[in-house]
Amino acid sequence: MTSQNPTQEPENNDHLIISQDSQHPANLIPELCAKFWHLGWVTGTGGGASIRKDDLVYLAPSGVQKELMKPEHIYVLDITKQLDPKQRIYLRSPPNLKPSQCTPLFMAAFTKRNAGCCIHTHSKWAVLITLLLESAPNTTMFEINNIEQIKAFGKGYTKSGNLGYHDTLRIPVIENTPHEEDLTEYLEEAMEKYPDTYAVLVRRHGVYVWGESVHKAKTQCESLDYLFQIAVDMKKLGLPWLSDVKPIA
């Protein structure tokens, strides 16, 4: 298991999380987490979010009720100084709190996909999809097409434009582990195997979603949760997730 023991630089650098700008990461993360809590995505301190701004990464902490989170709860690290993943160096650490075990997974999105934001939810719809897939022919891939909301997703890393209505959205599934940080290597493997994906489902656990900006990550996370809900209802009605709808000439 990867150690999450943080190394704190001498000065706590509280100035990094103090800003009147509503779009500053230290203000945005608590706002987003409160919204996600109301959606049922981050119940009981589960889940989280992280934003990268230039070389600085802002992270929600572990163990804080998401609807009560404040800027002073936010961790900050410099992505260029993380030479040893087993010993992260934080520029700013809130007192009496612990870094999230999601941190190495968020870092994977930033370093391997140049993401600007990564969101982790425990959405019941994400969990249900992974359960439904346990009895599917392909247990490690969620696929759906011919649904309008698919247009919210980009075509893939380094590619321009978004998916179309008739395209197939594919989200890989990895198995859960007893400790969240131990998911990192499996998440990274999924990123390598499926370079066009913007999300990875974790069996009986939740989903990680990222994007090049906060706007894109949030849009894709909301759209994916909508598609998960649609897919669960489709399964109840005996409707296939993949269909052969002919384009209108």
Swiss-Prot record:
Catalytic residues (UniProt): E148 (proton donor/acceptor)
Catalyzed chemical reaction(s): 5-(methylsulfanyl)-D-ribulose 1-phosphate = 5-methylsulfanyl-2,3-dioxopentyl phosphate + H2O
Gene Ontology MF term list: methylthioribulose 1-phosphate dehydratase activity; zinc ion binding
Cellular component terms per the entry's GO annotation: cytoplasm
Annotated positions binding substrate: C102
Keywords carried by this UniProt record: Amino-acid biosynthesis, Cytoplasm, Lyase, Metal-binding, Methionine biosynthesis, Zinc
Recorded metabolic or biological pathway in which this protein acts: Amino-acid biosynthesis; L-methionine biosynthesis via salvage pathway; L-methionine from S-methyl-5-thio-alpha-D-ribose 1-phosphate: step 2/6
Pfam families hit by this protein: Aldolase_II
Cofactor (UniProt): Zn(2+)
Entry keyword annotation includes Transferase: no
EC number of the protein: 4.2.1.109
Cofactor note: Binds 1 zinc ion per subunit.
GO biological process: L-methionine salvage from methylthioadenosine
Entry's localization field: Cytoplasm
Name this protein carries in UniProt: Methylthioribulose-1-phosphate dehydratase
